[in-house]
């Protein structure tokens, strides 16, 4: 029997030795490819030049074999790490509390004073096992021993967020928007505890990912450069200049393997030096701080006993070494002595190094009593708070909830095993998906496969169930195409990374070296650089197209805004979706690209287009509302007085408004509140419309109905309300905590109004009461104006008019008074005596603030908060003299600014004239003919014109009308105006042109008689009226040189009448 066992064991041993030897050989063979591993995968080059030589083919074959070996090895290492990590997190040791003594009377544990740190399953560190047993007895909890020694992750963030860890998925935690502000460990204020923990979990996931990537990279670098480690001296490696290019893990090309390793060692050496410098700096800072604290606390050293120091409550704040603020020096020293005492205990515990190993509890045994209560794969649990750590390393609310998760994990494992076995069976019995779909590959047209609706369910490669084999193959082909396109993009990016730095304005300059390469688009290129140039060009074109699309969208937006502004004046005339327009011919291009007869018809088309867009949008909104109603039908019957009461169950749901709510009930509550607000808003609008048509404002009835139940509870003008949170919005849009607080504010306002009315009646005169009521707003006046809110609180003024609120009633009165007061002051200043007085005052002000003028920086004066009240020259009290001078300087600056603005506004602006100078030469027969080009322009009169030419035509027309009005005025008035204004256009003799009639838009109406006159410009005019007309139209200043025709020596040019003469 023994001989038989030996004969069986020998072949097994030989097999194992051969496997180990082959593994070592594989590692040595694939050693050079380990540095190119990324995320457990190896990508081999697919360049065509490798296939042209025998060495290249051997290299690719070697890479392909190493790819399989290294990827398999990476998977096994990953699995081993996962298995090694699992028992650490999921194997808490047993806690036996029978070994410790209990008190005879109270039954509490009597614990020794030694320090043997133990980490509990709740994540906290306890001094020893006895202390943990005492805590269990005190709180009635069942905390076990997670591990010996201090907890590695006992930082406050994880302890605070332990309740949320079971709900984390891939580092993300879904939270509600509950408003319960919490200050996080990073010093930021978060909306609630869940939001704070979600941010912390995200940071943890990012840090873990970063650490894993750096660890993998470092291991690969270490294995790659193992042969050069002994040659490194002080972080430097000396290499030859042998040309054997190697790509490093950072994507850069190096001269050879040694050069790459030299850079890696240099970087590692610099990082280690910086770390040691940081650690030395921190240690020096700690010792320095400790030395200072020892000096400060030396006086209290003798008073401390066993690390305890008794202090008074004297308030003299000081910051301790831990960064916290302490009440006084004694309390800071007390904290320091306690910390020192704890450190001593820990050091003694480490020196003793006593450890006990406990046995892990079996979760299957712990959850055996709950297994009978499982129904349809679910276990119904209470919300009892008894934290326990589960097999997944997370802390659960109680044993029942932990067992529920344990059963779910068991079910998932069973399903996975069944799936694996089913897949094995399918792989044995059925062909692969490629073979299955090979017959459908020929039937594809333009990348699509047309299938029937035959019902023959089959599971596809994506794990989904498809109606039949054809539809499954269509999904399979689409998946293949996506994977192929993605691989091409990634390959192109990786191949062309070395050329990306050489790109300038989307172009890459290449040599004409002939080394054909196939690009990701399937075309052949002259060399690798030319292929990358085409890739970069395509990228640049895509970016350009995106920019053009964005530009088009922005241009359409600007055009739409211009059309809306242009059509705003016509919007009031729309009736039943139609706009009545004239047939005036003034062509303009609309937003739809069509040419319309005039602006009015264009606006009509624009309004119709808007109405159609609204009609299209309405069904979507209606469908959305109906969907909301259907989802919330089950909760509608639970409404009580328009309110819905919900539990705090955590089952996040996204509502129709895009917000995430705690559960479905909370979402429906928000929907009902929105419906109520819309209903109230409509009712208020109807009431306002009714009040506008009626003689008196009818807003009181609704408020009385709303607050009828609270009106009876009002006693002595006061109403007491609870703090119930049920937000309500009143008619003026103001939010209140609940309906009671809203009604309280309304009823108090009504009571104040009644008191004011009774007071005004008792006084007898409305004017006096008006003065009293508006006194509170006098202090709010700025530069003679009062700014009011739009609060709806109707008040009847002393003149009998109804105003929106008290402020608007007083605004007219106070602004009128301020204007009258300013007018009087201006009249007084015009007198010489007043001027001298004001000059003396300003001199006094300057004398007062002379010492502070030199201290101004950029027109500002920086003052301290010294309390030394001073009354300023305008009667206002200031905190000190500097603050008074600051207000004086501000006032002076404002006055200077106003004067500059008045000066600039008083000067006549000839901008419009200057802009239209280019069009003056094109005026023919007193008219300017403009093209129909659509280029909207904003004129100086605030109107929009089709283009610049139309704007200038309007400017010339207004100028002609102004000149015509000047001509119609009496001679003495016109002469005085011409003397005063240097820019006058006509300086003709008033007696010459006054007898002729002027028509607007036409000019002078001249007779047909022939009385030639010679102008000083050398031209002959039919009569003096024609000379006046030419001066008006051409804006010249021609005088009569002589009667009769001009001499033959001068170039006579008898002007034809630019307008039809009259029949007179």
From Swiss-Prot:
Keyword annotations from UniProtKB, A to Z: Cleavage on pair of basic residues, Disulfide bond, Hypotrichosis, Ichthyosis, Protease inhibitor, Repeat, Secreted, Serine protease inhibitor, Signal
Cellular localization per UniProt: Secreted
Key word Signal present: yes
Domain Kazal-like, first and last residues per copy: 28-66, 91-153, 155-216, 219-285, 291-352, 361-423, 431-489, 490-551, 561-622, 626-688, 701-757, 768-830, 843-905, 910-971, 987-1048
Residue ranges, annotated region (Disordered): 676-705, 751-775, 818-849, 895-915, 967-987, 1041-1064
Tissues where this protein is expressed: Highly expressed in the thymus and stratum corneum. Also found in the oral mucosa, parathyroid gland, Bartholin's glands, tonsils, and vaginal epithelium. Very low levels are detected in lung, kidney, and prostate.
Modified how: Proteolytically processed by furin in individual domains (D1, D5, D6, D8 through D11, and D9 through D15) exhibiting various inhibitory potentials for multiple proteases.
Main location: secreted
Disulfide bonds: 30-66, 44-63, 97-133, 111-130, 119-151, 161-197, 175-194, 225-261, 239-258, 297-333, 311-330, 367-403, 381-400, 437-473, 451-470, 496-532, 510-529, 567-603, 581-600, 632-668, 646-665, 707-743, 721-740, 774-810, 788-807, 849-885, 863-882, 916-952, 930-949, 993-1028, 1006-1025, 1014-1046
Signal peptide per UniProt: 1-22
GO cellular component, one term: endoplasmic reticulum membrane
Domain of life: Eukaryota
Gene Ontology BP term (one): regulation of timing of anagen
Pfam family, one: Kazal_1
Site entry (Reactive bond), positions: 46-47
Basic and acidic residues bias locations: 676-688, 895-905, 967-977
Gene Ontology MF terms: serine-type endopeptidase inhibitor activity
Domain characteristics, as noted in the entry: Contains at least one active inhibitory domain for trypsin (domain 6).
Associated clinical condition: Netherton syndrome: An autosomal recessive congenital ichthyosis associated with hair shaft abnormalities and anomalies of the immune system. Typical features are ichthyosis linearis circumflexa, ichthyosiform erythroderma, trichorrhexis invaginata (bamboo hair), atopic dermatitis, and hayfever. High postnatal mortality is due to failure to thrive, infections and hypernatremic dehydration.
Function description: Serine protease inhibitor, probably important for the anti-inflammatory and/or antimicrobial protection of mucous epithelia. Contribute to the integrity and protective barrier function of the skin by regulating the activity of defense-activating and desquamation-involved proteases. Inhibits KLK5, it's major target, in a pH-dependent manner. Inhibits KLK7, KLK14 CASP14, and trypsin.
Entry protein name: Serine protease inhibitor Kazal-type 5
Protein species of origin: Homo sapiens
């Amino acid at each position: 029997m023994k001989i038989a066992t030996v004969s069986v064991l020998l072949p097994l041993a030989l097999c194992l030795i051969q496997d180990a030897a082959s593994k070592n050989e594989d590692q040595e063979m694939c050693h050079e490819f380990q540095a190119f591993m990324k995320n457990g995968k190896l990508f081999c080059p697919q360049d065509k030049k490798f296939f042209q030589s025998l060495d290249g083919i051997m290299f690719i074959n070697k890479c392909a074999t190493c790819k399989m070996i290294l990827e398999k090895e990476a998977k096994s290492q990953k699995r081993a790490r996962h298995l090694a990590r699992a028992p650490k997190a999921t194997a808490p040791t047993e806690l036996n509390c029978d070994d410790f003594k209990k008190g005879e009377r109270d039954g509490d544990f009597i614990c020794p004073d030694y320090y043997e740190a133990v980490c509990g399953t709740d994540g906290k560190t306890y001094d020893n096992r006895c202390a943990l047993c005492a805590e269990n007895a005190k709180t009635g909890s069942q905390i076990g021993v997670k591990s010996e020694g201090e907890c590695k992750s006992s930082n406050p963030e994880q302890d605070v967020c332990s309740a949320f860890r079971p709900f984390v998925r891939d580092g993300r935690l879904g939270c509600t928007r509950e408003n319960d502000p919490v200050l996080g460990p990073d010093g930021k204020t978060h909306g609630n505890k869940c939001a704070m923990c979600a941010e912390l979990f995200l940071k943890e996931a990012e840090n873990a990912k970063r650490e894993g990537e750096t660890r993998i990279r470092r291991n690969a670098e270490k294995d790659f450069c193992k042969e050069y480690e002994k040659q490194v001296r002080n972080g430097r490696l000396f290499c030859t200049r042998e040309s054997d290019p190697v790509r490093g893990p950072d994507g850069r090309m190096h001269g050879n393997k040694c050069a790459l390793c030299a850079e890696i060692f240099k970087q590692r050496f610099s990082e280690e030096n910086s770390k040691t410098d940081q650690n030395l700096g921190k240690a020096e800072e700690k010792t320095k701080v400790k030395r200072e604290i020892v000096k400060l606390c030396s006086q209290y050293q003798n008073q401390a006993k066993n690390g305890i120091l008794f202090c008074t409550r004297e308030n003299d704040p000081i910051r301790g070494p831990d960064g916290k603020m302490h009440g006084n020096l004694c309390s800071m020293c007390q904290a320091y002595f306690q910390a020192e005492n704890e450190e001593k205990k820990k050091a003694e515990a480490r020196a003793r190094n006593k450890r006990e190993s406990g046995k892990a509890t079996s979760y299957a045994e712990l959850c055996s009593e709950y297994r009978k209560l499982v129904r349809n794969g679910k276990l119904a649990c209470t919300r009892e708070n008894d934290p326990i750590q589960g097999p997944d390393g997370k802390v659960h609310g109680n044993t029942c909830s932990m067992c529920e998760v344990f059963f779910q994990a068991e079910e998932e494992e069973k399903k996975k095993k069944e799936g694996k076995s089913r897949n094995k069976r399918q792989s044995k019995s059925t062909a692969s998906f490629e073979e299955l779909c090979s017959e459908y590959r020929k039937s594809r047209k333009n990348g699509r496969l047309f299938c029937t609706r035959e019902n023959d369910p089959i599971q596809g490669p994506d794990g989904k169930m498809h109606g039949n084999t054809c539809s499954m193959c269509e999904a399979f082909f689409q998946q293949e195409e996506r994977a192929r396109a993605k691989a091409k993009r990634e390959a192109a990016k990786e191949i062309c990374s070395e050329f990306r730095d050489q790109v300038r304005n989307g172009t890459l300059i290449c040599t004409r070296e002939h080394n054909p390469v196939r690009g990701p688009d399937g075309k052949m290129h002259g060399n690798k650089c030319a292929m990358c140039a085409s890739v970069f060009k395509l990228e640049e074109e895509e970016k350009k197209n995106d920019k053009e699309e964005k530009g088009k969208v922005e241009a359409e937006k600007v055009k739409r805004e211009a059309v809306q502004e242009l059509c705003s004046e016509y919007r009031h005339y729309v009736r039943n979706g139609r706009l009545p327009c004239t047939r005036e011919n003034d062509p303009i291009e609309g937003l739809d690209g069509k040419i319309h007869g005039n602006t009015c018809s264009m606006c009509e088309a624009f309004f119709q287009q808007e109405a159609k867009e609204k009609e299209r949008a309405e069904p979507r909104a209606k469908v959305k509302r109906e969907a909301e109603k259907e989802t919330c039908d089950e909760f509608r019957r639970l409404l009580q007085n328009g309110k819905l009461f919900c539990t705090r169950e955590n089952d996040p749901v996204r509502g129709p408004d895009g917000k995430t709510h705690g559960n479905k009930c909370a979402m429906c509550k928000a929907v009902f509140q929105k419906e109520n607000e819309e209903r109230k808003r409509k009712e208020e609008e109807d009431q306002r419309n009714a009040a506008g048509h009626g003689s008196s404002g009818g807003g009181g009835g609704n408020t009385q109905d709303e607050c009828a139940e609270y009106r009876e509870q009002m006693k002595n003008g006061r109403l007491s309300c609870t703090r119930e949170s049920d937000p309500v919005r009143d008619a003026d849009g103001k939010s209140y905590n609940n309906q009671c607080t809203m009604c309280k504010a309304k009823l108090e306002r009504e009571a104040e109004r009644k008191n004011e009315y009774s007071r005004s009646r008792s006084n007898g005169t409305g004017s006096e009461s008006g003065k009293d009521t508006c006194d509170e707003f006098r202090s709010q006046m700025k530069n003679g104006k009062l700014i009011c809110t739009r609060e709806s609180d109707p008040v009847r003024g002393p003149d009998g008019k109804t105003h929106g609120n008290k402020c608007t009633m007083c605004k007219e009165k106070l602004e009128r008074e301020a204007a009258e007061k300013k007018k009087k002051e201006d009249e007084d200043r015009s007198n010489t005596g007043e001027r001298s007085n004001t000059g003396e005052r300003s001199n006094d002000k300057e004398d007062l603030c002379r010492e502070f003028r030199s201290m101004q920086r950029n027109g500002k004066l920086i003052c301290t908060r010294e309390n030394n009240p001073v009354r300023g020259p305008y009667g206002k009290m200031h905190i000190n003299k500097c603050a008074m001078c600051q207000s004086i300087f501000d006032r002076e600056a404002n006055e200077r600014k106003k004067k500059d603005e008045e000066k600039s506004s008083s000067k006549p602006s000839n901008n419009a004239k200057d802009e239209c100078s280019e069009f003056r030469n094109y005026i023919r027969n007193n008219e300017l003919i403009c093209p129909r080009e659509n280029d909207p322009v904003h004129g100086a009169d605030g109107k929009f014109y089709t283009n610049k030419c139309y704007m200038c035509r309007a400017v010339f027309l207004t100028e002609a009308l102004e000149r015509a009005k000047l001509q119609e005025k009496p001679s003495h008035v016109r002469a005085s105006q011409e003397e005063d204004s240097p820019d006058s256009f006509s300086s003709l003799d008033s007696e010459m042109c006054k007898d002729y009639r002027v028509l607007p838009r036409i000019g002078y109406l001249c007779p047909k008689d022939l009385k030639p006159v010679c102008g000083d410009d050398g031209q002959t005019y039919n009569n003096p009226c024609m000379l006046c007309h030419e001066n008006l139209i051409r804006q010249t200043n021609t005088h009569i040189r002589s009667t009769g025709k001009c001499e033959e020596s001068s170039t006579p040019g008898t002007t034809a009448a630019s307008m039809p003469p009259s029949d007179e």
